[in-house]
């Protein structure tokens, strides 16, 4: 929060560990401090994604009107250190979260096309409308995974994400450049969707 106070372009995302005592107070503090989302990566926190701790956080975030952010992975498995054994987030976990609360909004990062399609098409339209995806792990040309997702799901479901510092920020920008998107769709992905998501406290 101190860094955000010094830099007007920054927005805070508070990490919450729902397995620790007093996490509810941390959530209240984050909301009061103007955080745009709270984050919990169950694999790295040593928690089951479907366990009571994560489901309690999902419900609490929904009740507080603040989005919950989680990453499918943080880096390519081929480059991970042997001691980095945290499991990747699975599509079924995201579907369980979105069904655990009628008000929670989810931001899922580092998901590939298959993961996104499995969750999106396995959810009801109302559920899918409360999930946003960053594009950091979605292939662009020549495979055109991003183009296909935008054609089938619409630009409103996507956010610009780079995966920094473990991935290059230029890559997702190049993917958008190669697509020659309408100006409105590009603006939605690069900033409008995020601004709308951060600026409202309830669905």
Across the structure, where does each feature detected by a protein language model lie?
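Active-site gating/metal-coordination segments in enzymes
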Residues: 1-76
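Conserved hydrophobic residues forming the short capping helix/wall of the S-adenosyl-L-methionine
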Residues: 4, 123, 180
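Solvent-exposed polar/charged
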Residues: 5, 32, 99, 151-152, ...
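Short N-terminal helix/helix-N-cap motif within the alpha/beta-hydrolase-1
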Residues: 21, 116-117, 169-170
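Secondary-structure boundary/capping motif
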Residues: 22, 49, 141-142, 168
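Mid-to-C-terminal alpha-helical segments outside catalytic/metal-binding sites
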Residues: 28-29, 153-159, 167-203
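Catalytic pocket-lining loop regions of alpha/beta-barrel enzymes
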Residues: 36-37, 50-159
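Active-site glycine-centered loops adjacent to acidic/histidine catalytic or metal-binding residues
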Residues: 163
